[in-house]
Amino acid sequence: MSKSRLTVFSFVRRFLLRLMVVLAVFWGGGIALFSVAPVPFSAVMVERQVSAWLHGNFRYVAHSDWVSMDQISPWMGLAVIAAEDQKFPEHWGFDVASIEKALAHNERNENRIRGASTISQQTAKNLFLWDGRSWVRKGLEAGLTLGIETVWSKKRILTVYLNIAEFGDGVFGVEAAAQRYFHKPASKLTRSEAALLAAVLPNPRRFKVSAPSGYVHSRQAWILRQMYQLGGEPFMQQHQLD
């Protein structure tokens, strides 16, 4: 290898190492800060806003209103656990069994990719990372997930998740969603309304709370059954998530 190539390689290596240190400090500081402080915005919110501006849509506003867990209906927390991650109170950030099932499914159905992200993983991804699928992003997501699982309580993870989850075009967080779709605060959401909001979470840019498709209605009904099977509101109290 020539001297010039060695110099370029050395420069790139130093740059990447420094970048990794900067990102580690930034993300580590974010994890520490948001363990107690309200989250003003997420990486996904920034990405959506910038994308709208780049496409000339200056009317788009990524909107979110932070609320604490005691200002959120217990049905809402239960609904997203029933819909997205029923082992949330028990795991350490990853549901290994679900990951194995998703990998097996994806091998058989390459055109219908199934995910297995837990609420903890989705929180890490939405808060700190860009959208998309890549091994680099998955690796960073895993590290950030371990970080928030180590520093935050399960209640804190659920609180942040509910405040940054995307529920529609420009609608982020359960308070903004409750006000937009039901004209009430998140604390007043009923069991059925919570299940409807949770039903669009797989793809809130495709599935609409304001105009639910047959699939969304069937998923809402399934979530309601799962909420009942989990034990209803006592489930949240039992795991200190309310």
UniProtKB/Swiss-Prot annotation:
Its membrane topology: Single-pass membrane protein
Record-level GO BP terms: cell wall organization; peptidoglycan biosynthetic process; regulation of cell shape
Localisation: Cell inner membrane
Main subcellular location of this protein, as a coarse class: membrane
Pathway where this protein functions: Cell wall biogenesis; peptidoglycan biosynthesis
Residues passing through the membrane, by range: 19-39
GO MF, any single term: pentosyltransferase activity
A Pfam family this chain is assigned to: Transgly
EC number, UniProt record: 2.4.99.28
Gene Ontology CC annotations of this record: peptidoglycan-based cell wall; plasma membrane
EC top class named in words: transferase
Coiled coil: none
HAMAP family named among the record's database cross-references: PGT_MtgA
Functional description taken from the UniProt entry: Peptidoglycan polymerase that catalyzes glycan chain elongation from lipid-linked precursors.
Name assigned to this protein: Biosynthetic peptidoglycan transglycosylase
Gene that this polypeptide is encoded by: mtgA
